[in-house]
Amino acid sequence: MIKAAVVGASGYIGGELVRLLAMHPEVEITAITSRQYAGKKVHKVHPNLRGLDLRFTNDYNFDADVIFLAVPHGTSMKIIEEFLGSAKIIDMSADFRIKKELYEKYYGPHEKPELIDRFTYGLPELHRKEIKKAELVANPGCNATATILGLYPFKDLTQEAIVDLKVSSSAGGRRENIASIHPERSNVVRVYKPYHHRHEAEVLQETRVKAMFTVHSVDLVRGLLATIYFRYEGNERELLRKLLMYKDEPFVRIVTDKGGLQRYPDPKYVIGSNFIDIGFAYDSENSRVMVFSAIDNLIKGGAGQAVQNMNIMFGLKETTGLEYYPVYPV
């Protein structure tokens, strides 16, 4: 059994990690940490996990083969040296996803720049071989995951793309702020990041395409839809051929329906799963491609992708512990 610890398990992604790992047939959870909730049972914070015999601790002296760092951005770089060499590490924050120059442009100074190059970017569909050999993996951001996987097959067709993102409230994390309380958040379609979103850096690094994000908060608890626009003069068949690079990927579903409500990806149909649904439309008259990609931001955009990376790192079947379909209706 793989001994797993989750550092920062009180947040939404931390809770989903605990849920997925608790059901994983090859994993034993040895520790879940939280400074705020140390000593409390896990269901006091994550009520859906009632019956799971785990308590939060604030002690980092635990036995683990893999450590998931589910802490806020900027925290991993402060604490990571406590864990280096003791276990494989999967970092859920942005601290080690991008190279030093890009990090400083989008986030500011980095406290441990010498460690960045030791991390592998944890997008299995693109870096499976590297992840298999890695000791340190940086889990991608949710917006970046949806955009990179949607854009990557077409990266040679354009140098720029406009990306419209519709994101749910859970993407903002669990910390209290005025924008997330129900009277302010309910029924909104709110622009909150019209340009220079930090996840643009991950897209640029992975695709070499300059992606210009505009992010909207919408009235969903979980789920994310990326609509990616770029110019293209060609034929639709070639676009489909490029997208079929994913045809053997266990968690990529290519949506090609020509009619009905489900003819394009919709986050409603991936909730609770590690799937990403990708489809496209081609406006030949105006030489415009629209790629649509939908994920559950907490699963394929977070905890599920981390478990997928863990499976690869430990030589397990990649889908182990993730072999379930989305819940419906939601």
UniProtKB/Swiss-Prot annotation:
Its family remark reads: Belongs to the NAGSA dehydrogenase family. Type 1 subfamily. LysY sub-subfamily.
Per UniProt, which keywords does this protein have?
A: Amino-acid biosynthesis, Arginine biosynthesis, Cytoplasm, Lysine biosynthesis, NADP, Oxidoreductase
Annotated pathway: Amino-acid biosynthesis; L-lysine biosynthesis via AAA pathway; L-lysine from L-alpha-aminoadipate (Thermus route): step 3/5; Amino-acid biosynthesis; L-arginine biosynthesis
- From which organism does this entry originate? Pyrococcus furiosus (strain ATCC 43587 / DSM 3638 / JCM 8422 / Vc1)
Q: What is this protein called?
A: Putative [LysW]-L-2-aminoadipate/[LysW]-L-glutamate phosphate reductase
Q: Which GO terms describe its biological process?
A: arginine biosynthetic process via ornithine; L-arginine biosynthetic process; lysine biosynthetic process via aminoadipic acid
Q: What does this protein do?
A: Involved in both the arginine and lysine biosynthetic pathways.
The gene name reads lysY
User: Is the keyword Transmembrane helix in the record?
Assistant: no
